[in-house]
Each structure stands twice: as C-alpha cells, then as structure tokens.
Amino acid sequence: IMGNRAVISTKVEGIPKKYSPSIYLHWNGGRPSVEAFLKCAKILGVRLGDNQYSLARLCQVISNFLGGTLSIGVGVYANMDTDNGDNGVYWIKNGKIVKREFDGGHEQTATDEEFDELVDYILEKNKSHFPVKFTGKEYQLKNEWEE
C-alpha cells in the first residue's frame, strides 16, 4: 500500500483554481484525520477565515503531529497528486470541508470516541507550539500578558 494520501486545498478569490494553495498528505489523509486537523487548528486559535495564513498554520499543526521530515508537502493545486487513488482533494473554507474531488465515492469514518482521541493526540503534539491553556477537555487561548 502506498499511503493514505490526500490534498487539502483552499480557493483564493481572484486566483485561478490551478494556483490554489494546497497541502499534500502522504499519511493521515482520511476524512476523520482532516476534520480533526481542522478542529485542532480552530482550538489552537488559527485564524481560519484568512485562507493563505490559515493554510500555513494548518500545515504547522499537521507537521507537529506527524513529526519527522517527510509525509507532508506544500504547493499549488496544479502540482499536487490530486487524483491519488486514496482520498483525493478536500477543498476547505473557513476551517470546514466544503467540497471533495477524486475521492472515489468513499469516505473513511471514525467513531466519536476515535475522533476525540485523535483530536486529543493532535493537541498534545501541538500544545507547546501554540498559546493555549489545556485543562482536561477544556482549551482556552492564553493571554500573553497573564504570565
């Protein structure tokens, strides 16, 4: 098996689709992982309405989770492996999946418990990189002037 590949892309107004900023995932490209990455980005305070900025921070969240030096790439849609035989393309806007391409008509799923465990694990891998207070299941942005 080659991986669990996916591309996450976002449309920027005034820019042709082929130049849309995109993230390539070699692993963790299933819908539960992508939705968990997006949820964690929101919890971690990423400005999800600013497409280019939020894609950069989403890339950071994913890279912190994956670790190492492989398994993730960035570029424009035209240069991505969009029809990859795994999960295809997730088009996102404001931190939500709004469209799919090349998904082969199937979606990976996770139970609520599996999804919550994945979110917790992603947050654990990211908590030292973002100004967020973690108290059990509660997350709160830190006020930099508090401490």
Regions found by a protein language model. Name each.
Residues 11-18, 92-96:
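Short acidic-glycine loop/turn motifs at beta-strand connectors
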